[in-house]
Amino acid sequence: MDSFNKVFGALLALSIGLAGQACFAQAMPATAGETLSGKHIVLADVVHGHEAILVAGFSHEGGMKAGEWIKRIHADPALAGVTVYEVAMLEAAPSFVRGMIKSGMRKGMSPEQQDDFVVLTQDEKAWETCFGVGDDKEPYVMLIDAGGKVIWRGHGAASDLEPQLRAAAHQES
């Protein structure tokens, strides 16, 4: 029985690892969005050719927690050369409310910060798959290499996961 448990555990770990690799190889959705400054943008296009970090919120609560990630990434000298975009998914919000939501997001943000904050209103399921969303109340983070390949993903508190992001970015450099 003990050897069965070892073999079963090894097979389970292998299958989880292979499933994870399939997710990392997946292409980013080519969804058109808009920055808070009003510029039309396709994230898959603008991040291609250089390393980038995407920090996404898929709910109000997740979006509020994403701000802590942005602060920590910008304060970390090891991540200084990496382009960072904050992403808010508003597909579920009624269209007549989206303008008010975006107005609230803009408050207290400089024009430069607004240029790096992307609002998406379609393809939510594709983005949830890309980020590996399980709990939309968490912020989700992806590190993407210059070829557009996802090399690290995480979700949760920045204080817990930022060292992993930094290590992944350092390995990629």
What are these regions (language model features)?
Residues 22-44, 114:
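N-terminal "domain-start" segment that seeds a small globular fold
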